[in-house]
Curated annotation (Swiss-Prot):
Ranges of residues in domain RRM: 5-78, 308-384, 489-560, 599-682, 704-781
Compositional bias per record (Acidic residues), positions renumbered to this chain: 179-189
Keywords assigned: Nucleus, Repeat, Ribonucleoprotein, RNA-binding, rRNA processing
Encoding gene per record: mrd-1
Subcellular location: Nucleus
Recorded family membership: Belongs to the RRM MRD1 family.
Lineage: superkingdom: Eukaryota
GO cellular-component term (any): nucleolus
GO biological process: endonucleolytic cleavage in 5'-ETS of tricistronic rRNA transcript (SSU-rRNA, 5.8S rRNA, LSU-rRNA); endonucleolytic cleavage in ITS1 to separate SSU-rRNA from 5.8S rRNA and LSU-rRNA from tricistronic rRNA transcript (SSU-rRNA, 5.8S rRNA, LSU-rRNA); endonucleolytic cleavage to generate mature 5'-end of SSU-rRNA from (SSU-rRNA, 5.8S rRNA, LSU-rRNA); small-subunit processome assembly
InterPro entries hit by this protein: Mrd1_RRM3, Nucleotide-bd_a/b_plait_sf, RBD_domain_sf, RRM_dom, RRM_MRD1_RNA_proc_ribogen
Reported function: Involved in pre-rRNA processing.
Protein name (database record): Multiple RNA-binding domain-containing protein 1
Region ranges (Disordered): 77-116, 176-230, 256-299
Biased composition range(s): Basic and acidic residues: 277-288
Amino acid sequence: MESSSRIFVKNLPPTITEAEFRKHFSAEGRQVTDVKLIPARHIGFVGYKSAEDAARAVKYFNRSFIRMSRISVDIAKPIADSKPQHKSPSKGSSKDADPKNAPKVLPPNTKVTAAAVPKVEAAPDAPKRKLDVLDEADPKLQEYLDVMGAHPSKKMRNAEGLPTTVDEVLAPAVPAGLEDGESDDEYEDIPSRTHNQSHTADQEMVDAPLAASAEPSESAPPVSLDATDDDWLRSRTNRLLDLVDPEDAAFALRPAASGSAAVSVPSTSVENTASAKPEEHPAEDSREMAATSTHDPESAISLIEKTSRLFLRNLSYTVTEDDVREHFAKFGILVEVHVPLDSKGHSKGFAMIRYEKPASALAAFQTDGTVFQGRIVHILPAAAKRENKLDEFALSKLPLKKQQLLRKKAEAASSTFNWNSLFMSQDAVNTAMAERLGVSKAELLDPTDASAAVKQAVAETTVIQEAKQYFAANGVNIEAFKTQQRGDTTILVKNIKNTTIEELRTLFEEHGTVLRVLMPPSGTIAIVQFAQPVQCRTAFARKAYSRFKDSVLFLEKGPKGLFTDNVAVPTDARPAGVQKPSVADLLERDDAEEQLETSSLFVRNLNFSTTSQGLTDAFKHLDGFVQAKVKTKTDPKKPGQVLSMGFGFVAFRTKDQAQAALKVMDGQVLDAHKISVKASHRGLDAAEERRREDMAKKAANQGTKLVVKNLPFEVTKKEVRTLFSAYGKLVALRIPKKFNQSSRGFAFAEFSTAKEALNAFNSLKDTHILGRRLVIDFAQAEDIDPEDQIAAMEKKTRAQVNKVALQQLTGTGRAKVTIGDNDEDEV
């Protein structure tokens, strides 16, 4: 059974309030996502962020005291779980426990008829009496009635409307409020449920939503006197909470996944959250919530197969898009995750998700009623997303330039392709360099100069290097620009001229909270970080290709993991300046010890008895300590309990503090185990791992020769020499030619030292010349050892011999075959 993030509490004080209940189970910084309290039954439910938090809460609060009551805490059982077996009755009560002798309990609002009343069998020797038929002509009966009618209280009985005659006594009861002659068809006879009728948990799951949605005012069925607290709770519990609207009842008419949801009760009070706030559904979100045109599970499944979208309700108000994506990504690839936020940036308690394949959406739909972050999530099919597609007929009437602009703006939000995140337009680079040199762009770009392309390339290289240094000084991970994954909170803003940071902040704050805006002194590129992904997407869609001052904004989604720290820079803080390196710093190779790329540490070889609290106690004395956590898994033999996996993670504020902690704690003994501390590295995709392996090989075999690819065919050898000689002394430069003496599109540049080659590689790897981005790499080292050359020649010769032998074997299959005798004598 999958561990739940909800706990069940029994034996609560009868006068405890909801605020006290929440405060008690939020002790020691525990994050409570849901609270359901039933003071009359002394029970309650508490939801936590994760199953590990719930397991720790059970271990901490079980058999503890609230006031003078010792509470019992356990993991909440699933909805589809079978009812617990009652304790075996004693011998004295064996007769009463017999189902045949047990009294039948009729459902409420049941009209009792003579046929429904069970007949009591008399003893064999008892005299038989006729009680069903009374003879009103019997003189003794009339005498008895007359005598009884002479009693002084007869008038009082008549005044009160009490029955005084046999007809009145035996007359059937008429419901109050009905006059003679009125129809009482609305009062239906409800047949009593027989005890030998068996119902599975799945059938109860189907019947409960119908009863809850069709007759909400109907009282719960009575429970026998010997019922336990669990039986009483189940009789009062709606299987799917009060989340099912009448129009959405059809979507809930199916059993939830077995063993994956916790028992709860319908909430009749205000939502129990730390930031209690109603679910405000804006018009644009309510239109896309759930489809209400279908009323049966088959229609719901067919709708999911068409749209692959789901609507999630009853989510925690602290849930994020990453939490929803991580929880539902196990069913398939998620294309879209949308969690609406209120004006304060908090979740509204519902979300929309869309899968790549309908089968994945159907698998996720089957988890309706399961527990997610301590709350029972309700899943409904969602209608297709409304997209404002461009009308080709109306678009054709616009000018061509306007058509292209509208198409670019429509494709900007969904396009993830970009060939170089640090690419800057030549006009912006030339403007920045002209302002720095104090000249006009016409003077900078001399038409009589043959090396104008080289000047632009050098200017772009200078601006890019300054931007990299500025971003690195302000907490930006420069290596993140090489990744293909796009983030959801950052935007790269380009094509900006004569713009300040305050103007950019004012421009983007119209769509949400801006955490920080970074723009290098050149003013050619800027990074804008938002607090919420929804705000970032809105700003990107509104501002892409929009006019700002005298130019058009070019926006790109920032790469994932762009910032090395998650601490937001205050709005009034000024970015740090750029420290310009000296010539000696550029020529010196950094041989210092490799620094950590993360502020988290990986701790292995932990004792299985070591808990997160024990790991915290071992590291909390170190400077910059944030948190420590031991990785756990669910115990298959003991549901609801967790087991340590023997390793954990420790987070620090900065990389330097993590580096110092690694040196101090590596090799220390914790709970009789010598722990091993290393830097924590996140899993990379195959492309990134292959890229890092290639870089490691290149770093190990760095030489003095560079290969320059994607070279424009129009560029000359003189221009290439001018470009590379600015970063070191060139020993040789070779541009291979075709038979017509034109360039083949690549070149080889050899420097005098490896340091100069490395400086040229780092400086020119993002440079463009004549509109082409230079792809620079270290050339493969030449074999100097004669033995290596001989071995390579032998290998090449063996390959040629094997190829010839293979051709001989496969070529004989086409030999001509003669059938019959062609040398027949002529007649």
